[in-house]
């Protein structure tokens, strides 16, 4: 039986929490965006056609649906038990 130093075991156990691909190039944190934004007119709100798409967002088939409209309609619905029909 060969005896291995205990320090090797501790070193291996300490590296368990390193995520996969952490040492690959470009795996660091993305660069921070600048805080300054170009001045826009406050009186003209942006419409849905003028909004820029979010980077990395997938384009799904079909019309764009506003989530708040669905939530408003859903809040107006009520449960009707089978006996009251």
Swiss-Prot record:
What name has this protein been given in UniProt? Small muscular protein
One short Pfam name that applies is: Chisel
Q: Which family does it belong to?
A: Belongs to the SMPX family.
Query: What superkingdom heads the lineage?
Result: Eukaryota
**Where on the chain is Phosphothreonine found, per UniProt?**
47
UniProt tissue specificity: Abundantly expressed in heart and skeletal muscle. Expression is increased by passive stretch.
Which keywords label this protein? Answer: Phosphoprotein
Q: Which gene underlies this protein? A: Smpx
InterPro entries per UniProt: Chisel
Chain segments carrying region Disordered = 19-63
Q: Which GO terms describe its cellular component?
A: contractile muscle fiber; costamere; cytoplasm; M band; muscle tendon junction; nucleus
What does this protein's UniProt record list under function? Plays a role in the regulatory network through which muscle cells coordinate their structural and functional states during growth, adaptation, and repair.
**PANTHER family, A to Z:** SMALL MUSCULAR PROTEIN
- Sites bearing Phosphoserine, chain numbering: 36
